[in-house]
């Protein structure tokens, strides 16, 4: 009986001994929080884009669009890397890619049934607000060796209701440049 217990005891002790010899280590996390030197050029920092005057008949159905008006936001003195653009502002309920229009800056009633859509040069729309762009590639530029880059953009009216009413159709949209 002692011959059976002795090997069994040795087996149990060897199994527990390997657990007692566990190794310890350390994980080192490194990184840097950096103040970006990137600047929006003075001529594109506070832009006014005139979208034009259109009759209500130019928006006969939901999704009708006006002509697009081109504009740019240019960056300078940037570190190398990818930068993204985020627009903020009040949006049309159920349409996260449309800025709500109002009569801000004017007198009279605001138009209804339309919003302002901001797109890239290919017509891909930006989501307004939370940074989750409908088309993520829309919002990125890579800084050139000279520290400069330009977002080429367009804006237009787009109807979200089949009953568009006349009035002022103005909106403002603060924007943020983010280092990615």
Swiss-Prot record:
GO terms for biological process: cell adhesion involved in single-species biofilm formation. GO terms for cellular component: pilus. Residues 1-22 form the signal peptide. The keyword Nucleotidyltransferase does not apply. Pfam families: Fimbrial. Keywords: Disulfide bond, Fimbrium, Signal. It is found in: Fimbrium. Belongs to the fimbrial protein family. Fimbriae (also called pili), polar filaments radiating from the surface of the bacterium to a length of 0.5-1.5 micrometers and numbering 100-300 per cell, enable bacteria to colonize the epithelium of specific host organs. This is Type-1 fimbrial protein subunit. The lineage of its organism: Bacteria, Pseudomonadati, Pseudomonadota, Gammaproteobacteria, Enterobacterales. The gene is fimA.
């Amino acid at each position: 009986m002692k011959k059976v217990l002795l090997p069994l005891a040795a087996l149990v002790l060897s199994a527990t001994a390997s657990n007692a010899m566990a190794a310890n280590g350390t994980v080192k996390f490194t990184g840097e929080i950096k103040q970006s030197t990137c600047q929006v050029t003075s001529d594109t920092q506070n832009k006014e884009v005139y979208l034009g005057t259109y009759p209500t008949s130019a928006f006969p159905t939901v999704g009708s669009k006006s002509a697009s008006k081109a504009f740019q936001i240019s960056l300078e003195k940037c570190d190398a890397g990818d930068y993204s653009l985020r627009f903020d502002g009040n949006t049309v309920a159920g349409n996260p890619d449309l800025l709500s229009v109002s009569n801000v800056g004017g007198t009279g009633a605001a138009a209804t049934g339309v919003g302002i859509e901001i797109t890239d040069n290919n017509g891909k729309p930006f989501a307004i607000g939370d940074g989750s762009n409908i088309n993520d590639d829309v919002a990125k530029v890579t800084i050139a060796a000279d520290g400069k880059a330009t977002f080429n953009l367009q804006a237009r009216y787009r109807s979200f209701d089949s009953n568009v009413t006349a009035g002022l159709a103005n909106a403002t949209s603060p924007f943020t440049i983010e280092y990615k």
